[in-house]
Amino acid sequence: MKVATEWFPMGSYKCQKSPGFYMHDTLKQTIDLWVKNVQNDWDFVIIISGQGTVRVGKSVLAQQIACYWTYAIWKKYGILNDFTLKDNIVFHGSELIKKGNRLGQKEKYGCLVFDEAGADLEGVKAMSKSTQLIKDYFRECGQYNQLNILCIPEYFDLPSGIATNRSNCLIDCYVSVDENDMWERGKFRFFSAPAKKKLYRWGKKDRDYFATKEDFHGTWDNVYVLDEDEYRELKINALKTREVVSRKEDKRMKYLKGCVHILQEDFELTFSEIARRVKTRMKISANKMYFSRLMSGEKEEEEDD
């Protein structure tokens, strides 16, 4: 089915045969249902993954869904929100809350796509840094009744709170092979809230995306609804910035370890006492196991709200 016909007249993109761009019927119906219900103080979260692989077209599909959401909001409520790379796409987790607040205060029923630069390359490392930022974003910006799209390579890298309870669906993208052994993008499997919960529970250990059956599967066309060249340039710039940010984060972590070491050795404080004092002074949740893992170099365990 073609959607957003008024925004994409003939000549809007290469090989266009009719106004609008193609969207799978059931996917469109799902978005329409959310658009209908958003007025009753709901917000929605879509996770788009790529079976742990890269270059499968996740970003293109995410932008198409965001574009159609914006179009459908306009048609149903008469609210014409902006839809631009600057306002609606986030490349760094550190920008989520800032952009989310700005969008929520500026627009009603807006849409934000988190398409983190470098996530495809860094995998678990990238997601572990982003998880707390995503949680903080949902805490602060959940009241804005927005559509939020998390575009990530690996669904199973998410903590269970986001993967199962805080999101409405999973759209997993994959590559197929045609009759000439050529790889083709443009296919997805859609998991509803109950289905993705089963997938996470049964598939996480082996990262098995076929641990349970999807609700439906479909296709999308390789149509950029935002300027492709500008998008690629912004993402490349975001990658360069990310390298600088990562070095700063590593330096801060070394400072933190040094401070904890001084508290242990010079002041003879236990991890429990350090956690208690941090909690009291900073008014935040603090756990002794965090400091234990920090100093031993172990991976932080996922903590769900």
Walk through the language-model features, giving the residues of each.
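N-terminal pre-Walker A segment at the start of P-loop NTPase domains
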Residues: 1-41
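Short, amphipathic alpha-helical "recognition" segments used to contact nucleic acids or chromatin
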Residues: 250-269, 302
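Short, basic interhelical loop/turn and adjoining N-cap
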Residues: 270-272, 276-296
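Post-Walker A helix-loop "phosphate-sensing" segment adjacent to the P-loop in P-loop NTPases
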Residues: 67-87
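Short, charged amphipathic recognition helices of the HTH superfamily
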Residues: 39-45, 263-280
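Glycine-rich phosphate-binding P-loop
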Residues: 45-70
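Conserved nucleotide-sensing/catalytic segment adjacent to the nucleotide-binding pocket
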Residues: 85-148
